[in-house]
Design a protein with these regions (language model features):
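Histidine-anchored nucleotide/phosphate-binding helix
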Residues: 73-92, 297-307
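Short glycine-rich or small-residue beta-strand-to-loop segments that form or flank ligand, phosphate
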Residues: 62-73, 98-104, 281-283
Length: 433
């Protein structure tokens, strides 16, 4: 059978055996315009009054709308204009509205990315602010402590807002169980200290810090407690189909609407593992998720429940922006072929640096497959650099990627191995029985 896999902006077409185990989401395509879907959602909210009624009771201050950054493939341009028009129709001026980008520790958005995400009109007419976790002057310390006993420091614009709206993509998440909802606030809008704790060794070493698991998941418990300390007044949860188009919205009370969205995602993009595969062929999600190797790690971790011990993974990502941050590149190079040393060092608190959590999650994959069986294909990173990233490196020019991967697949098929495939990468998650 011929299967289209997401890869960069264009994708790859690969031939697989008909008997391959296929992990794909089963969302039905929505025929309704995204803006109209969103309006229907906010007029028929889960667990709250409609947005218009809530806005009538708002406190004095700005209307802050929390949005995701470029690493999330939310097509804001398809519904945000309608949301802003709806808010303005309630008697609110444009200069009373702030779009706050929940970057966590990601870099600030570029102008080009803002135009891509929101459209030129919104960029020209609304104030857009990127959260900077390292800027202590832009943080406010709240009374009380988080679930872990940590201080809660949140973005000043969010805390001081007269009305808070959060938006987010709900999908499985390899640390928090599911994304969206409370995750827009923590780690999206918190301090550097909170992010370090949230992504620290102890949290991520817990077996329940994993895809589609919420119970006893320390990441979920922590960010839920932070979100409850300064909750949103309204939440808009977005579900994307396998083509990264909006499938539906669940809006309303922050926690009720998020739980409803999670139930929907579980039903449509979480597939129980019936038979373990000898080899997995997986996308890393395509653009924009696979822009960096750092983000591609999500695709590597996602497929673990579907593969046997010492199984083989063939993964691929466009990596048009390369490996990731400077800190991440340096870390990966320093601990190349020394991943156990890395775990010991962070466990003993010898250091904490940005993006170390991604290597900790990466090591989960290495422990199951070994580095030789963890193949990664890309045209965005040189062979020398890719070889330092604790994978079996395959770097080829763009016009040779598809052919090279197909040859590898053909060799696996010839060996008689049972194959599982993930055409969408981490947007469909295997769940252990």
């Amino acid at each position: 059978m011929n299967i289209h896999f997401t890869y960069g902006k264009e994708g790859l077409n690969l031939k697989l055996p008909d008997e391959s185990i296929v992990y794909t989401s089963n969302y039905e395509s929505a025929d309704i315009d995204a803006g109209k879907m969103m309006l229907h959602s906010i007029l028929n909210p889960v667990g709250s009054q409609s947005l218009s009624k809530l806005l009538q009771k708002r406190k004095k201050g700005k209307i802050v709308i929390v949005v995701s950054d470029i690493t999330r493939p939310i097509p804001y341009h398809s519904f945000l204009p309608e949301l802003l028009t709806y808010i303005i129709d309630q008697g609110i001026r444009k200069d009373e509205i702030i779009l706050l980008v929940a970057t966590g520790m990601h870099r600030a958005s570029t102008l080009k990315e803002k135009v891509y995400m929101f459209g030129q009109y919104i960029v020209d007419n609304y104030l857009i602010i990127d959260h900077r976790a390292e800027n202590i002057d832009e943080l406010i310390t709240l009374p009380g402590k988080s679930w872990s006993g940590n201080e809660i420091k949140l973005n000043r614009h969010y805390v001081e807002a007269g009305f808070r709206i959060i938006t987010g993509l709900v999908e499985t998440h390899f640390m928090s169980g599911f994304s969206g909802g409370r995750k827009s606030i923590c780690p999206g809008l918190v301090s550097l200290d909170s992010i370090q704790l949230f992504h620290g060794y102890n949290f991520l070493n817990h077996p329940n810090a994993s895809n589609a698991i919420l119970e006893d998941n320390p990441c979920h418990q922590e960010n839920t407690s932070v979100a409850r300390a300064c909750p949103a007044d309204f939440s808009i949860n977005i579900i994307l189909d396998q083509n990264k188009k909006i499938n539906c919205f669940f809006s309303g009370e922050q926690f009720d609407s998020h739980e409803t969205a999670i139930s929907y995602v579980k039903e449509n993009s979480c597939k129980k593992v019936e038979v373990l595969a000898d080899a997995v062929i997986t996308s890393c999600g395509g653009y924009p998720l696979d822009d960096t190797f750092y983000q591609c790690v999500k695709g590597l971790v996602n497929c673990l429940p579907a593969i046997k011990e010492n199984g083989e993974i063939i993964a691929f990502g466009g990596c048009s922006e390369g490996t990731g941050s400077i800190e991440y590149k340096q870390l990966m190079k320093k601990y190349s072929f020394r991943t156990e040393d890395f775990l010991n060092d962070i466990k003993n608190g010898l250091f904490f640096i940005k993006d170390q959590w991604q290597l900790q999650m990466h090591i989960r994959v290495l422990k199951k497959t070994g580095q030789n069986n963890l193949h990664f294909y890309t045209s965005g990173i040189s062979h020398d650099e890719l070889s330092s990233l604790s994978v079996n490196a395959h770097s080829f020019p763009e016009n040779m990627i598809e052919k090279s991967i197909q040859m590898h697949i053909d060799s696996i098929v010839a060996s008689g191995k049972k194959i599982a495939i993930f055409p969408e990468g981490p947007y469909c998650s295997p769940i252990e029985k």
